[in-house]
């Protein structure tokens, strides 16, 4: 909203955290939603999003190379699991999609749409914000995700969530 709306919400003690989320790449078929075929996500048709999409594609490729260098066994398994995925549905070389969450906390869930055996790469940018940590109850652990960090995690395997994000200064954020 505008400055007046923000001031009103602040005086009322309401949440002032701006949140955005978008999925890049492809979507799996969802026959129950009258979409029996895979498709590219709608953001790809938005001219203003093209620079963002290219930047995310580049970040994806760079992260894949880090996985290849540090954990070649994970990289090779991921490549094998994606052998049957057509190139047109891939985002990078070993994923079908990428999600960008700006100040988004997530309730507990399991990524049931992921291919069993795969890993997710979570790249985090943050500034003047607390929270936004990955909580995995099965491991009794919460992963603090520092600025410029990368976490590799099999999100299909366990229930997990993201803790609330609280800016500690004006324009504070957490993006992953």
Regions found by a protein language model. Give the residues of each.
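Active-site lining segments that contact anionic ligands and/or coordinate catalytic metals
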Residues: 118-120, 131, 146-150, 175
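Conserved metal-binding segment of the jelly-roll/cupin
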Residues: 123, 143-158
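A short beta-strand-loop-beta hairpin characteristic of the jelly-roll/cupin
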Residues: 124-146
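Short coil/turn segments at secondary-structure boundaries
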Residues: 134-138, 147-149, 156, 163-167
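Fe(II)/2-oxoglutarate oxygenase catalytic core
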Residues: 1-118, 126, 142-143, 160-176
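Generic hydrophobic secondary-structure signal
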Residues: 100, 125, 134, 150-153
